[in-house]
């Protein structure tokens, strides 16, 4: 920081304002009342319509160029020698001139120096002057080295910024297209830069020529040097102005390049997002491939299940045929039994039992047929559901095919467009070749993936079509089989109805036969009553016959009891079978249960009839017992009819033997039939269990089918979402392609501009180096002049004191002017360096502001800060609304605001100081000219 900015208010009396800062001076002793430069301006001085002003701290003294902090220590502006005036009359304008200028230091020296030791004092002064000159020479060398290092570091920093600008130049073209005014301004600036280049080249040539002249001239030619320096100062001022204009132009270009760099970064982020979305599309496509394979496997499983169902339906048809054959066989047996029953009326009880058994078998067969029919109906429902699912899958596959075809066409079009755009970008841009190649690779991968998906889809489509055709054939075959089975079932129902009708007819016939048997029994009773008398007569003869007959009756009773027991066992087994059938029939539909109930009622009626017949048989047995008693009584009467009775008994015995044989055969056949029915029951139970498992598996499969349908719906939704995202990606790709074209064009233009900027920067560095070399050469020249002064002072005699005083004062004045000039050059150099540093800092802050407005993340090492942006040109062409710090700053030289009192006062003070400095400069020049004339007139020749 500058010491001038921290001086107390009282020290302002000794300060001199120059175009580049404050300088301590003994001349500036006027007691002018100055407005405090650190005072905060009042808000009322500005526009009255503005709002309240924000508070801020008291600023430093140097408020004119406070942002730059340009000024070095004030000690460097101190006079290295006191000013010497010899025989100079006082100026008539004493009010405008400092009192310090009236001092003549020669008189003071004469007063202070004792006359006895002039040589010693002179040696002491010379020694002190040598020390001071040596120290000053060292300081000047160090300052020169520091300036050179600072310039080199500044050049390196500029090169870094130039490299950054190069990387961002290809994005400036968008601003030029959007804002034609900036293009026109830029053209004018380019013309001005060309003019400046030409001028700089001419100035460089002039400087080289003048350097050669200065080096070739002798040391004594100081008047020419002074004139040349004045010309150089003027040219430097002009060059500084031109440099400022060029720097402003460079700042504008850098700001534009920063904005374009931010846009480029945003577009790069968009490209990255696009790449990520393409990767997501790839992953989604892979997932869909896996889902398609999974669905193919499910279709294969369904085809296998359909084949199994077909095989099972064939087995069921075979079982139905077998049962139909069994029903036919049982019908034939019924017919045979009916014929036998008609032939053997006395054996009605056994035949009725056989009829019951056959009826039970028929009922069981009907129940089995009903269960098989229900199973067939369930399987038909399953087949219908499977067909519906297959049709749905076919429709979805067709939709997928159409969607994939549209996707393929769209992707082909987009791929063709992308390839054309990528070829153009390869020819025009080198920086984006890698990105474009990556995009091409990804597009090719997507094409390959789509081609693979197409192949797999076509294969799956062919497989599914073949499977569907085969399943359609199977379904048609099954439908035909079902029709045949239904026809057979209708025929069976008709036959059963006919048999029921025949059974009713046979029942009526049996009732008629019962009536005839009762009549016969009554006739036999009458005959027995007639025979009683005969039997009483023949009782003695038939007593032995009676005993034999009783034995035979007891054996018959035993056989009947055994038959009853076997009948009870068979009835128990039949009841168990009925219970099992009822349990199985509970699973059958309600219609079949009603039919079974009706048939159970019929069976119960038949059992009641059988019981009645058994009661009748028991009554007949009681009658037979009575007949036996009567027979004992009528033995005497039956002597005559014994032969007839014996014949009857023989007939009865033969009938009993036949009935016993028939009973045995019936028992055997019943056992065989019971075993067969047990086997059939076991088989039916196994089939029932298998059907239940199939039913459960079918329900599970229906659930799986519903889940698959849901998945297919989800896949359709995902497909629509993917299509929408694909359209978005196409739009974004078109935007990126247009942006790429813009950036390519801007890159070409910026490459041209960057070359011009490089040339300008190289020239600036050369000029700086020339200035530094001139400063060092001037310092060496001053040192030589001082040495010559010392030598000339030693050579001069004591008599020529006036001439010596004139020469000393002349060289002192010249030395002071040169020192001031060197100090001014140093201050200018520091000012330029600091302006460059602030310019770079401002560029960084502008980039930060642009990145913040575009939401771009900054690097971690950038710790700069920017309060607000105050470029009128930038805000005019950009609608960025940066918040300003104060209301007063909303107006100004760049914002068309009325000047505040402080700025006006400081400008007036600067003008006054400039006037004073010009006056002092003219007075010094007059003094130098007068001294030179006096020396020339006294010596008659030029002595320097």
UniProtKB/Swiss-Prot annotation:
It is found in: Nucleus; Cytoplasm, Cytoskeleton, Microtubule organizing center, Spindle pole body. GO terms for cellular component: cytoplasm; nucleus; spindle pole body. Keywords: Coiled coil, Cytoplasm, Cytoskeleton, Nucleus, Phosphoprotein. A motif (Nuclear localization signal) lies at residues 54-59, 726-731, 742-747. InterPro entries: Spc110_C. The keyword Lyase does not apply. Residues 28-46, 67-78 have a biased composition (Polar residues). The modification Phosphoserine is found at residues 60, 80, 529. Homodimer. Component of the SPC110 complex containing at least CMD1, SPC29 and SCP110. Interacts with SPC97 and SPC98. PANTHER family: STRUCTURAL MAINTENANCE OF CHROMOSOMES PROTEIN 2 (PTHR43941:SF1). This is Spindle pole body component 110. It comes from Saccharomyces cerevisiae (strain Lalvin EC1118 / Prise de mousse).
